[in-house]
Amino acid sequence: MDPRFINTIPSLRYDDDKCDDEYAFVKALCMSGGDGANSYSANSRLQKKVLSMAKPVLVRNTEEMMMNLDFPTYIKVAELGCSSGQNSFLAIFEIINTINVLCQHVNKNSPEIDCCLNDLPENDFNTTFKFVPFFNKELMITNKSSCFVYGAPGSFYSRLFSRNSLHLIHSSYALHWLSKVPEKLENNKGNLYITSSSPQSAYKAYLNQFQKDFTMFLRLRSEEIVSNGRMVLTFIGRNTLNDPLYRDCCHFWTLLSNSLRDLVFEGLVSESKLDAFNMPFYDPNVQELKEVIQKEGSFEINELESHGFDLGHYYEEDDFEAGRNEANGIRAVSEPMLIAHFGEEIIDTLFDKYAYHVTQHANCRNKTTVSLVVSLTKK
């Protein structure tokens, strides 16, 4: 391809012009592809559990969307941050099933449904699309219906769809990923993310980047979704309101930071390399989420819920199993970025260290995670 043409392609992230080589690893942000032992597809039990938790909100908003739009004959649904594997279809299945059951109940014909699966271009769409025939077969058995499935590669911090074309948007455990690493983290060296030892400036930098990104997300989706269309969004969140720096010793990025420090001590990773790595991630609390939505102004909040649940480690047979399962889950969501920055040769050792650190903290066996679920209506 002519490089002159490549240089004219619009940016996939709205602020890519500010993403320099210092944080080049952010461009590798995607889940581990394929269906092997270390893949996202094989290590996404938590994400499946979260989808099940949010199901009542999704069903309720799908029904209300259909009734408020007077049962349209065509529906376009988008799954943003779909990743790879079977989980990509769980929410879509619930949406289609809800629509068909409701239409039967009120004696209406079911609409034709387009389902758009979105993630960054680096995502393993091939593994996901292999499940499309099985998905449509299950729909036919359950609902005597099918849908049309499309891929929509690109950043959800950019425009993805034509104006007023979407009726329902769903996203689960994707919007806590930021478009870039925040600026002004020089005083947070040795930490991948916010910890209790971080300066207040690190928290403010992360919060500002989240506010900027989520505002942009809402603004872009408001152009793409029809009036009275719905969004159901689920985030990794936190409960703490008074201490914005609080992340306990079992927070997944704290454990990963400690594991990388072990490799620095052993001479496998340079300290400067560790200092140059920061996660493009933010876990908001309810108030922070609400403030961005209200300030941006395009959507009404229908529901905003906080759910805490354990990760299931307490029921695992031994500490080693708990440590290995959590290490595999974090590896599945961070490995491509870690390889891009640190190299592939340290990855197995790094997550052996991670699993060990989980076993050293009794609290990790009883660890809980917080999920925020918000449903929105386009004004």
Curated annotation (Swiss-Prot):
Annotated knockout phenotype: Loss of accumulation of methyl salicylate upon pathogen infection, no accumulation of salicylic acid or its glucoside in uninoculated leaves and no development of systemic acquired resistance. Increased attractivity to parasitoids.
Co-factor binding details: Binds 1 Mg(2+) ion per subunit.
InterPro entries: MeTrfase_7 (IPR005299), MeTrfase_capping (IPR042086), SAM-dependent_MTases_sf (IPR029063)
Alphabetized UniProt keyword annotations: Magnesium, Metal-binding, Methyltransferase, Plant defense, S-adenosyl-L-methionine, Transferase
Tissue: Expressed in flowers and at lower levels in leaves and stems. Hardly detected in roots and siliques. Expressed in the sepals and the leaf trichomes and hydathodes.
Required co-factors: Mg(2+)
Family: Belongs to the methyltransferase superfamily. Type-7 methyltransferase family. SABATH subfamily.
Protein name as it appears in the record: Salicylate/benzoate carboxyl methyltransferase
Species name: Arabidopsis thaliana
